[in-house]
């Protein structure tokens, strides 16, 4: 009788271990999926931000971590959950930009001495937050526009009846037909003290997505 009791206790501990392992799998899947969503969104934000600066479109909301639909990010979360043998639902949130994921394991706990475990799946939740790491820096000094040359004025005609039209005055230097100014250079100041200068006319040495935004798991 004592041996049977010990066996039952051992099987119960085994069932608890199975459940814990399945629960850990669910949490791993949820964490990975949430981070995958945040990282996908961060990459999209970075691309959209630099494109907006290059074309002169509004960009400050993008620098704040907003302005890109979360559809692709959530699709990335669901794909990563599948890599961890789980199904996931993803919900995008704002202020701060975040992605909440609930993952359910595809495998069950398995058969054990505890009734019903063969049909029990584990669930877990995770949330990733995307936060800006940079703020707008000082605006560059505007380049002064040279004034066009001034003319000498029209000449006067002679004093006869009809009067000659006279020589026309020199119109001075013709106005300079400068091409329209392109989008302005943008300075960014980031958390690590790094200063970035994004020049639309010279798109080199640009910040990476990880320089502009951080992604972390949150409670």
Regions found by a protein language model. Name each.
Residues 18, 103-107, 119-122:
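Functionally constrained cores in energy, signaling, and assembly domains
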């Amino acid at each position: 009788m004592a041996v049977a009791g010990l066996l039952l206790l051992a099987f119960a501990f085994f069932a608890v271990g199975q459940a814990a392992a399945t629960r850990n799998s669910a949490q791993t899947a949820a964490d990975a999926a949430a981070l995958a969503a945040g990282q996908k969104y961060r990459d999209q934000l970075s691309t959209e931000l630099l494109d907006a600066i290059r074309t002169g479109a509004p960009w400050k909301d993008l620098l704040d971590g907003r302005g890109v639909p979360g559809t692709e990010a959530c699709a990335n979360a669901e794909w990563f959950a599948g890599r961890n043998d789980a199904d996931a639902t993803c919900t995008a949130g704002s202020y701060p930009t975040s992605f909440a994921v609930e993952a359910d394991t595809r495998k069950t706990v398995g058969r054990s001495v505890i009734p019903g475990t063969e049909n029990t799946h584990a669930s877990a939740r995770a949330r990733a937050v995307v936060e800006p790491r940079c703020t707008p820096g000082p605006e560059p000094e505007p380049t002064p526009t040279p004034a066009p040359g001034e003319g000498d004025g029209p000449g006067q005609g002679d004093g006869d009846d009809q009067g000659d039209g006279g020589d026309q005055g020199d119109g001075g230097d013709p106005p300079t037909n400068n091409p329209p100014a392109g989008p302005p250079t943008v300075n960014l100041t980031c958390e690590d003290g790094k200063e970035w200068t994004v020049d639309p006319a010279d798109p080199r040495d640009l910040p990476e997505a990880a320089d502009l935004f951080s992604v972390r798991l949150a409670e």
